[in-house]
Amino acid sequence: MLRYIFFAAILFFVFPNTESAGFLKFELTADRDCLLHLEHSSTYSETVRLLAYESRPLEIYTQGSINEIPVHFQLLHHFSGKALSEAKFQIFQLKNNGLWDSKVIDTDKVILSVRSTFYCENGYFGPICDRRSRTFAPKSDIQTSTPGYQTQVLKFDFKISDDIIIYSSLAFFVLLLIIFNCILCCYRPKKSQKYLDVSLGSPKVFSICGYSADKSGNTTEYLDAPSRFFSSTKIECVV
């Protein structure tokens, strides 16, 4: 049961729910003065003024597990706000590759050039900005007693990516699982076992007895000693 809990915890930390976060940046240029109304779903709606042949930067914040977004464009008269064209939507890819994509919206009265690129929000990185990074920037300044003299002792920045956190969590839980198994093996009750060495054969029992025999004037005395595993015989001859 505990192993299933460990595996579930590992899966939770190794495969966390992540979402992308970044900005879709536009450079808008029209060939005449006009108003441009932009809409993205129900979360974004804005109207900006464009001057003839002047680029206007604009950014749309995006968040979620998406790879592309549709944006509606509608050109309006710069003074009355009357529609100069129907609302048209364009689809933009959310790829953090540093490249600019160009589109042209051509109407009867206004030609609109749309250049777009996508970049990550601070703290995110990756091809679609779906990986988080944690930045640590501890700073410490030490001032000496000498007026006008300051010494900066420590200033460093480093990032810990999601991959490092994932691998560290996985290694920690694997180590914890190994320790748990070792504890189970150490505290397992020991069973007494008896071993019988079959190579020794069945034990022999000898009785302690002494006897002598006379033959042809010679006396031979035999003494037997008991032993559990072997027997020894001492022979003494008296001539």
UniProtKB/Swiss-Prot annotation:
Report the SS bond pairs: none
Q: Which InterPro entries does this one have? A: Mesendoderm_Regulator
Identify the keywords attached in UniProt to this record, alphabetized.
Developmental protein
UniProt note on tissues of expression: Expressed in mesendodermal precursor cells of embryos.
Task: State the species of origin.
Answer: Caenorhabditis elegans
Q: Which PANTHER family match?
A: PROTEIN CBG11437-RELATED, SKN-1 DEPENDENT ZYGOTIC TRANSCRIPT 1 PROTEIN
Lineage of source species: Eukaryota, Metazoa, Ecdysozoa, Nematoda, Chromadorea
Q: What is this protein called?
A: Skn-1 dependent zygotic transcript 1 protein
Q: What does this protein do?
A: May have a role in mesendoderm development during embryogenesis.
Gene Ontology biological-process annotations: mesendoderm development
What gene is it encoded by? Answer: sdz-1
Q: What else is known?
A: Down-regulated in 12-cell embryos from mutant worms lacking skn-1.
